[in-house]
Design a protein with these regions (language model features):
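N-terminal hydrophobic/helix-forming segments and targeting peptides
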Residues: 1-165
Length: 165
């Protein structure tokens, strides 16, 4: 195996691990701690900044030729803004989440006590066979919802899962 393949495999595996950690803006502590731990394993000193970022000095010999790399560790997300009468969820965006490019995406809902539920983000009336306005309907957070992969049909059903506003 070539060195470049070895690094490519490592980078791919680490990227997958990092992307599996829920990290919407303001909720990045877990991913920051993971990144810091991985840098420590590689022998680097990593520190968390006041704002929750990770700062790593990779060393070098000539500071006049220093390079700085800056990257985001947060992801786009949403926050529950309403539990609808049928138990489905309305969300508001966190970060640059846009309703136009999130339709039919899988979502993970994290409760305050750490339980995780999955679902899908979709148009309120997602049946193209019944909804005559499906194709023309403007996608916005006001007309889209999270349909949970759970047997819920009321607000109370959803609240019993630990999901709330």
């Amino acid at each position: 195996m070539k060195i470049s393949e070895k690094y490519a495999d490592y980078i791919l595996e680490e990227t997958k691990k990092i992307l599996e950690i829920d990290s919407p803006s303001g909720y990045t502590k877990n991913v920051a701690e993971y990144v810091m731990e991985e840098y420590h394993k590689l022998g680097y000193k990593a520190d968390m900044t006041v704002k929750g970022g990770v700062l790593v000095d990779l060393g070098g010999e000539d500071e006049s030729n220093a390079v700085m790399l800056d990257t985001h560790i947060d992801t786009l997300g949403g926050m529950v803004s309403e539990i609808k009468a049928d138990g489905n969820l309305r969300i508001v965006p966190i970060g640059g989440l846009n309703a136009n490019n999130t339709e039919a995406e899988n979502v993970r809902v994290v409760t305050r006590d750490g339980k995780i539920y999955t679902g899908v983000f979709q148009l309120d009336n997602a049946s193209v066979h019944v909804n005559k306005e499906y194709s023309e309907k403007k996608r916005s957070f006001a007309c889209m919802e999270v349909l949970l992969d759970e047997m819920v049909s009321t607000k109370d059903d959803t609240r019993k899962l630990g999901i709330d506003v």
